[in-house]
């Protein structure tokens, strides 16, 4: 499904179902050097079980045109305009990694227009090492190899991931390379990492939220370790917000490495 947002064409995957304005909407946001496809299993399920799904390609990524966001705040502005273009009075936001920060920032701004915010593989601050930032800028293919080495806890997928024999590590590397090559004007890897590294409004955003929160965290995540989300969790609980925390025994790609557990967490959360 295509929308015109900020003067450019924006692609959203709908899970193979037509958009129904009578249903609630879940808006999925991917991370650095990814696209809508990282949510394929969870988004398609929700689309066939009572939800509208908009799994967006952020500007400059995948099938979406426009300049890629240089900050979390810019991406949150884009989400607000996407909701306006789609005619959404309300939506649930579900974000992974960089996308989780975008979801958090957007929810803090849009307040009652956001019914739920699910943060998958999140951290605050989401620091990126100097070595990885340098590799992302000067040797992006080397950086992609580094990312995937630290992101994954499994080489073979569970049975529910797209079928037996799926190579989750290789598929992730191929996606990263395709998204990188798809935008010759901007280095999407370095730009996204800088946006993560510089975002400083995590705790302030928690203070401004009005919706319930879900954290889905990988127990062996080396990119955004469990402990790196604790500040957000504690801040939200101290404010008396509704907070659910689900940990799964995988790394940074919860959606592919633990698809059923991640979906179960989302289903339970969205039903509240």
Predicted regions and their residues:
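Conserved alpha/beta-hydrolase "acid-adjacent" motif
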Residues: 222-228
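Alpha/beta-hydrolase fold catalytic core
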Residues: 1-26, 48-51, 88-89, 234, ...
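Short beta-strand/loop motif that positions the catalytic acidic residue
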Residues: 209, 215-217, 221
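Conserved alpha/beta-hydrolase catalytic His-Asp/Glu region
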Residues: 134-208
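Flexible "cap/lid" loop of the alpha/beta hydrolase fold
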Residues: 101-147
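Catalytic histidine-centered segment of alpha/beta-hydrolase-like enzymes
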Residues: 223, 250-263
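Active-site glycine-rich loops that stabilize anionic/oxyanionic intermediates
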Residues: 31-34, 97
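Active-site loop/oxyanion-hole signature of alpha/beta-hydrolase fold enzymes
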Residues: 2-15, 40-48, 52-98, 264
């Amino acid at each position: 499904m295509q929308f015109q947002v900020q003067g450019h064409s924006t692609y959203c995957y709908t899970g193979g179902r037509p958009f129904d304005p009578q249903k609630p909407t879940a808006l999925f946001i991917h991370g650095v050097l990814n696209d809508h496809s990282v949510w394929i299993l969870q988004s398609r399920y929700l689309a066939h079980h009572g939800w509208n799904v908009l799994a967006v390609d952020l500007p400059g990524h995948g099938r979406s045109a426009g300049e890629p966001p240089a900050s979390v705040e810019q991406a949150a502005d884009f989400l607000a305009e996407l909701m306006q273009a789609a005619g959404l009075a309300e939506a649930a936001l579900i974000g992974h990694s960089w996308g989780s920060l975008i979801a958090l920032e957007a929810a803090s701004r849009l307040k009652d227009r956001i019914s739920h915010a699910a943060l998958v593989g999140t951290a605050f601050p989401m620091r990126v090492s100097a070595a990885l930032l340098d590799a992302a800028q000067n040797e992006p293919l080397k950086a992609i190899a580094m990312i995937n080495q630290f992101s994954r806890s499994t080489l073979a997928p569970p049975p529910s991931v797209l079928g037996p024999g799926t190579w989750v590590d290789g598929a992730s590397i191929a996606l990263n390379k395709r998204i990188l090559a798809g935008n010759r004007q901007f280095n999407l890897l370095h730009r996204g990492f800088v946006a993560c590294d510089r975002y400083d409004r995590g705790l302030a955003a928690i203070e401004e939220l009005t919706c319930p929160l879900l954290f889905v965290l990988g127990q062996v995540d080396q990119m955004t370790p469990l402990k790196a989300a604790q500040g957000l969790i504690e801040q939200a609980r101290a404010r008396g917000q509704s907070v659910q925390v689900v940990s799964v025994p995988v790394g940074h790609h919860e959606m592919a490495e633990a698809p059923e557990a991640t979906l179960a967490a989302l289903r339970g959360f969205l039903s509240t």
